[in-house]
Amino acid sequence: MNWNPFRKKDVTESVDPLDVKLSRLKPGYVLDYDLKTWQVSAHHHYDYDGKRSDEWELSASDEVVYLECSEDDGFTFTLTRKIRISELNADIPIFIGENEDPPDEILHKGITYEADSSSVGRFFKNGEGTGDEFIVWDYFDESEKRTLSIEQWSDDRFEASLGEIVEDYQFSRILPGAVTEAR
């Protein structure tokens, strides 16, 4: 590409580093949580019949977690990690095939999770496209702080994740990532 001194520089949204909030993360941002520095590697969102929920993929060395933010009466944050569906105590895909829903109670590593809700939604990877439809079943432990989710993406594709409800004050040093100029 030839150099052109008269071309307009790409205009990027300026970010006030003193006004960066957990609910407004973008790819490239870094933040501290649980004695680790995490980088936001992606920003996805879900649509549950008009209710939006944001999800950020956070990476630290070889670990990946997902921070989901939903807004009802304020922001609720959930931090989750993917697990293999086969780690759960029941053969979930077969159970759903026979009963249309997973069991009301799931035991995982000594913790009992009770069914709380189910939703049909659309997932927008990187916030783009028409979205992929899925069904999610959400569970909570007795304290209602730990979560388990089962997602069905097709007749034979299931995913599971374990998580916990977190508070925004548990995250610190939220900084915008380096801005690179397009050439």
State the predicted function of each range.
Residues 1-183:
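Mixed-charge, low-complexity intrinsically disordered regions
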